[in-house]
Structures are given as structure tokens and as C-alpha cells.
């Protein structure tokens, strides 16, 4: 039993959909600070003299964003590994279906292990 996902050509078994990890929603963050043009210069001086948080200070928003990025990166790594496994399985199937062709005479290029996947960081919490 398969269900259609948001992509019309992609079918995902219901079991896989149930196990899918939802991606974190992005939180809006200001890209710059809006300073009022009518602000007196003293306000600017006050901003400079305020005590900045220490390096060890980690706001909850940053930690939440980092956790989302971490989870998304883990998911992307897992998907890339699954895609490589599918490609390797496909290559093995094609090789079995084409008897009499040597590996040197094959019209399909051999899949070599992707060096990028071998050097993916192993994340641990």
C-alpha cells in the first residue's frame, strides 16, 4: 500500500512515511539592527558601552537552531547513504542482467565509492 506525497512522481510506502523525521521549522531572525535616523548620538554610545554577553552565553534560540541544523544534517547524511546503497544495488542488478559482458566492456560506468560520503562527519550528541 503506497501513498502519494507532495511530489506527484514520488511514491513512499506508508511505513517509511510514518518513520520520517519532520524537519524543524525555520525561526525568523533579524539580519541587521534597525537604528532610527532620528536617534541622538548618545544612544549609539550607550549601545557601545553596554556589556556584551560572554562567549559561553548561548541563547535558547541559538541552541534550538543548532539542534535543528544538527538533526537536518543527520537526516541528509542518512538519505545520502541510502541513495548510495540504492545505486550500488542497481549496479549489481544491471551487472547480473547483462551476462557475457566483462566489467571492462560494460556500457555503464562503474560506481566507485564516493569520497565525500567516506569523509562525512560522524555526529554524536
Swiss-Prot record:
GO molecular function list: protein-folding chaperone binding
Function: Co-chaperone that facilitates HSP-mediated activation of TSSK6.
Protein family according to the UniProt entry: Belongs to the TSACC family.
Pfam families, per database record: SSTK-IP
Subunit comment: Interacts with HSP70. Associates with HSP90. Interacts with TSSK6; this interaction is direct and recruits TSACC to HSP90.
Region named Disordered: 1-23, 97-125
Encoding gene, per UniProt annotation: TSACC
Known tissue expression: Expressed in testis but is absent from mature sperm.
One GO term describing the cellular component: cytoplasm
Keywords recorded for this protein, A-Z: Chaperone
Residue stretches of biased makeup (Low complexity): 103-125
UniProt protein name: TSSK6-activating co-chaperone protein
Annotated Basic residues bias: 1-12
